[in-house]
């Protein structure tokens, strides 16, 4: 079963992306993605 997650920009805390991942995975997802509010690539972390 897959779990829906939301990725949040670390700088402006804007919720920019949604994705899915396995429920068996225990580590939080951290990706470098483009933020339209910051107008640059920033670190996006998984929200709870």
Swiss-Prot record:
Keywords: Ribonucleoprotein, Ribosomal protein
Family of the protein in this entry: Belongs to the bacterial ribosomal protein bL33 family.
Protein name in the entry: Large ribosomal subunit protein bL33B
Organism the protein comes from: Mycoplasmoides gallisepticum (strain R(low / passage 15 / clone 2))
InterPro entries: Ribosomal_bL33, Ribosomal_bL33_CS, Ribosomal_bL33_sf, Ribosomal_zn-bd
Entry's Gene Ontology cellular component terms: cytoplasm; ribonucleoprotein complex; ribosome
GO molecular-function term, one example from the UniProt record: structural constituent of ribosome
GO process terms (BP): translation
PROSITE patterns linked to this entry: RIBOSOMAL_L33
Domain of life: Bacteria
Transmembrane stretches, start-end: none
């Amino acid at each position: 079963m897959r779990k829906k997650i939301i990725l949040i920009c670390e700088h402006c805390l804007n919720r920019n992306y949604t994705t899915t991942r396995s429920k068996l995975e225990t580590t939080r997802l951290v990706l470098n993605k483009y933020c339209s509010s910051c107008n640059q690539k920033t670190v996006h972390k998984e929200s709870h």
